[in-house]
Amino acid sequence: KTKKSFSADLGVEENEILNLKDGDELILVRASQQRGLEMAREMERYDLAALALIVKAVNDIAAQGGYFVSFADQIICGEGAADEVAKFRHYLAAAAGKAHAVYMASSSVDVTTSIFTDGVLAAGVGLGIKRNGYAKKEPTEGDSIIGICTSSTAGIGIDIYSKVILEDMRNGVNDYIEELDEIAGEAMITPPPNYANLIQKLYDSFDVKDIIPISKLGLVPDIAAVTGGEDKIKIQPSDWEYPKIIKLMQKEANLTDDFIIKHFNAGIGLAIIVDEKVELPILLELNEMGVEAYSIGKIIK
């Protein structure tokens, strides 16, 4: 393919492809959400679960300093996944103009797990190009943690949502919940926002130490996985407002703030670790961009 047609397929600017350099790294990520997919099957809304997985892959790649490559803006399942990954190597080589120069450790990469016998997909797969020369910085005591707000659950804690909203409150997945102004199942598996452009802008414009998509275990454990332990961070949940679905959970199940920040995303889609000195300029810039963001915590050791 020509660079122009390739860039159109990827949804990226042509100059980004022209900037590929020797030493750029490929990133492969997989985002699984088995419970969400089961719920999607019951709702006949596979598109919601699929999109959630795609966007998780996009955000993970962007947070690693990479450009998302969208051959994988589809969900790939079963044996076909390895073939798609192998194909990607050749597309990337054509884009770089060096057909011999793109190396992948294996031509056959097992990237998905099929969880349904009827062929319904199990994982979102993303391949990206890591920007040459980008390096994250180690968080240090006193650094600030900025949170970007979201109304999406990101699929975190979905079993707890199911227990409270479906079982305890006796709702079906397709039932309308007045407090949420939404269908129960849709509220639980709403896809997270695509943060790729915002992440790139933050990396390019500010001295950001790390950016963490809150999309795996919960707000505190996802940040702790990067900082080296929960004892190294202090999150202040009173500093921002939870989305409607978490407020409903808190009311119905009498959940504490400490439980919420450990088992859900708590309404935070991205956590940004920065030096305390640049916290205010970043918050002001985000506010000007129309992005709801708050100082949510500190690195304490």
Task: Give, region by region, the residue ranges found by the protein language model.
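Helix-biased detector of long, well-ordered alpha-helical tracts
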Residues: K1-K301
